């Protein structure tokens, strides 16, 4: 009789443990909602979101999620864009790991003819308009897909948002020459819009810098 009672207790404990696990999983799933980072309309000016570039996905049964928005300046002579990607993973990566992933993504741009000048690399940290400390990497390079080749500048900037529990990766790209029409002097007006901040990041003072104002919570 003793052993029979012990067997019943074991089964009861197993059922209770299973119920607890199910509750924990469902609690995590419902709390694992992705807060999608975006650029507020009030700072976009003549920039607009490219709806066709909007993307996102769930992986690992919804335990990892991501969403991405792309904004363009709608200028054919000096094209520029900013992509804002939000990631909610089972475990939040470090900022250093995020930056490494971003550098890998920038390096893959060579498949589209974007050749980065490795000697031009600039790394650092700054605080955005919502007081998140970000890490960034900046390159100058060439867009060899254009004829003639055009000069470009590109930034990858990342941070973790503790409030929303998500990670944010921003990539900003700007063509700064117009060799097609004989304008080889750098035109940084769209680059300034991408990287500008109240504190004068890279010498560009602006309340409406796009990456500086990305809202993630």
Where are the model-predicted features located?
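Solvent-exposed, well-ordered amphipathic alpha-helical segments
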Residues: 1-12, 165-169, 209, 215
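Extracytoplasmic/secreted envelope proteins and their assembly/folding machinery
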Residues: 40, 103-106, 207-211
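Conserved polar/disulfide-associated segments of primarily extracytoplasmic proteins
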Residues: 53-167, 176-179
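Intrinsic disorder/low-complexity segments enriched in polar/charged and small flexible residues
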Residues: 49, 68, 161, 190-193
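Surface-exposed amphipathic alpha-helical segments
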Residues: 47, 169-217
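Short extracytoplasmic/periplasmic juxtamembrane "stem" segments immediately C-terminal to an N-terminal membrane anchor
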Residues: 39-56
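Secretory targeting signatures
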Residues: 1-39
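Short, flexible coil/linker elements and helix-boundary hinge sites characteristic
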Residues: 1-4, 30, 75, 110-114, ...
């Amino acid at each position: 009789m003793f052993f029979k009672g012990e067997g019943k207790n074991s089964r009861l404990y197993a059922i209770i443990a299973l119920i607890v696990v199910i509750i924990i999983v469902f609690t995590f799933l419902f709390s694992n909602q992705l807060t999608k980072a975006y650029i507020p309309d009030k700072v976009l000016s003549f920039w607009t979101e490219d709806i066709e570039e909007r993307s996102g996905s769930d992986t690992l049964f919804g335990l990892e999620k991501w969403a991405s928005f792309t904004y363009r300046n709608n200028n054919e002579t000096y094209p520029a864009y900013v992509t804002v990607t939000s990631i909610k993973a089972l475990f939040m990566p470090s900022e250093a790991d995020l930056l490494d992933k971003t550098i890998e993504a920038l390096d893959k741009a060579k498949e589209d003819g974007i050749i980065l000048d490795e000697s031009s690399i600039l790394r650092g940290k700054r605080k955005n308009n919502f007081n998140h400390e970000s890490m960034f990497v900046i390159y100058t390079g060439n867009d060899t897909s254009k004829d003639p080749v055009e000069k470009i500048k590109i930034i990858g900037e990342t941070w973790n948002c503790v409030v929303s529990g998500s990670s944010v990766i921003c990539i900003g790209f700007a063509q700064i020459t117009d060799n097609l029409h004989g304008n080889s002097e750098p035109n940084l007006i769209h680059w300034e819009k991408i990287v500008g901040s109240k504190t004068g990041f890279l010498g560009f003072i602006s309340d409406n810098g796009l990456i500086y104002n990305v809202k993630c919570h």
